[in-house]
Structure formats: structure tokens, C-alpha cells
Amino acid sequence: CLLFPLGILVISDLVIVPYNSFLIFLLQIAVILIIDDFYFYWFHRLLHKNKFLYEKIHIIHHKASNPFPADYLYEHPLEWIMGLLGPFIAFLILGEVYFETIALYLIIRVLHELDIHSGIKSSMYKYFPFAGVNEYHALHHKYHSNHFSSLFSFWDIIFKTHSKY
């Protein structure tokens, strides 16, 4: 939990700038979410497709048998560290980011992860096109071989890892 704030502290002088435009704020959050989720898709897919990484690292997350919001925290430390690279890549690509954008990014990601691991049928995300809803993620936890995206299910469609089961 301390890794993300420490990372922000390290790069704060490089990327954090004062807030001055709502439009830029919206563009920043959209770009960060897309880049982070693209990274997450490929990292998550690698964790499943590489037998060593799955058996030694990612299987820990899939050992949680009953959906519970805190299950998203149930991961190997290396998976946590590598998972944090996505937003930092986005921050560095953008070059300048508002602190408010980073705060909203964290709120969205944490609430989304709590939601998709809640085991509750449907969610607020079903109203957003291409959003990864609870049922979608539940299929991933049930079958393990598809549905690697998190926020945006279109990655699975684009890269042909979507399945109706």
C-alpha cells in the first residue's frame, strides 16, 4: 500500500503540475485509465499464459474461492509491484499530470477492483460501454483462461481473449 505513494513522491517533481483546466483533467484521466488498463491486460495475460508466473505468483490471487471485495488485495508482492507500473508509465508518457488526476485515478481503480471482486451481480459499470462488469470478471475467476482485461473489456475483444462461455 505504501509503494504507490512512494512512487508518486519519487516522480512528483517530474510530472505533477498545478491544476488549471477541467478539459485537460478529463483528458488526463481518460489517457491514464486507457494506458494503465492496456498494461494491466498484457501483464495479467502474461501471468496466466506463462506457467511459471502463474504457478509461483498469480495463483495466489486465484486461490480466493468466494468473491469478496478485499480479494483484489490478495496477491503476491511481485504482482503488486509489477501491477503498479501501468499508471506510472501513463504518468511518464503524459509528462505532466495534475495531482487531482492522480487522486481520481486511485479512487476509480480502487472502487472498480472492490466492485468486480464483490460477488454482487451487476454493478454501476454495466451502464458504461466496454466496462468490465462483475459478471465478466467472475467468468475469469471461474475459468482462468480468458477475460484478462479489468476496466475496459474491449481489450479482450481486440486481442481475442473474450469468450461467452
Predicted regions located by residue number:
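Transmembrane alpha-helix/helix-exit interface in multi-pass inner-membrane proteins
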Residues: 9-10, 34-53
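Internal alpha-helical transmembrane segments of multi-pass membrane proteins
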Residues: 21-29, 97-103
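Helix-boundary and loop/linker segments of multi-pass membrane transporters
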Residues: 17-22, 58-62
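Cytosolic/stromal cytosol-facing helical appendages immediately following the last transmembrane segment
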Residues: 47-165
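Alpha-helical transmembrane segments of multi-pass membrane proteins
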Residues: 29-40, 104-113
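Alpha-helical transmembrane segments and their lipid-water interface positions
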Residues: 3-4, 40, 48, 117
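Specific transmembrane helices
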Residues: 1-17, 25-37
